[in-house]
Every structure is written in structure tokens, then in C-alpha cells.
Amino acid sequence: MERLAEAPAPAPLDHAPILLAEDDKNDIFLMGRAFDRAGIPNPLFVVHNGKEAVDYLSGAGDYANREKFPLPGLVLMDLKMPWMDGFDVLAWLRDQRQFDTLPVVVLTSSKLQSDIDKSRELGAYDYRVKPQRFDDLVRLLDDVRQCWLDERFNRFWMLTSDSSAAPPRQMPA
């Protein structure tokens, strides 16, 4: 696939939008409630399949207006979606230089080691299995947000690594 032009800089990470790529309406509803319960201040944008995720990230079609659909600071992505699955989106992202440091966290019901391995091979920063209990989902989302969008974490990363490398997969102690 063809590379896109340089993307505009995203918002400061602690308030950066989060893009959720999820096809299940019940999971979308629960995620929205869990975001509210966790007190996550980041705006949440939802796409319903992998093709919409690519369109959103590339600013194509309905997502061309960057004021209305700003670049996210974090992507939460299901694997099993119609039109284009999470693996296809990860492969597309790997070819898009401007998204080299965009954290993508796979959030799926699959516990298969092959899915975990393939996600990591394709560049996922993290892999989380959707919990069964709502309170566990709240904790998981808060943990993911703190790990990938917390300014303290990102300052640590910027000071301790070269800028071409992806941040580490775990929050420093």
C-alpha cells in the first residue's frame, strides 16, 4: 500500500484522542461506560471495522476533517472484525512511517498464542484479553491509558531512548 504524507502532530498525550476499532455493539457500549467509570478524560472515537480504522487514520473519506476526527494518541483494536481484520490493520500501519510510534493495543477475546505472536510480529505494542467482568475492564482500560498516554511515562521514554524506537511495552517503575 502507498505511504501517506506526513501526518500532523497529535494532541498532547494525556488528552489525546483514543481510537477504538471494535465491531461488537455491546463491547462498544461497555467500553464507553468503562471509560466513564475509570474517569478517562481522553475523547473516544469509534470505528466499526478495520477498513474504517485505516480510513480514520489516513484521513480518508468520511474522516478527512482532522478537526472533527483528530489523530489518536492510542489505538485500541479488536482482531476479529469485518471487511479488514486487526491483523490487516497492523500490517497496514507497519508500512506507514508516520505511525511508527503510534501505540496500538490489541484488545480482543482471543487467548490464542498464535494471535498474540502474530500481533506482536505486526507491531502491536500490547495485547490484552477482554475481561468478563465490568470492573476488570475498567481497571484494564485505566492501566492501558496510564501506560501508553501518561505524560510521565512518555517523558521517561523520550529521555531514555532514541526517537526512532518505539516506547517500551511496560510502564517504568
Briefly describe each language-model feature range.
Residues 1-19, 25-45, 51-54, 58, ...:
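Non-catalytic signal-transmission and effector/linker regions of two-component phosphorelay proteins
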Residues 46, 83-84:
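Residue-level signal for the "D+5" position in two-component response regulator receiver
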Residues 79-81:
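Receiver (REC) domain active-site loop signature in two-component systems and cognate sites
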Residues 111-114:
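Conserved phosphotransfer active-site motifs of two-component signaling proteins
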Residues 125:
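Short, glycine/charged-rich "phosphate-handling" switch motifs in NTP-dependent
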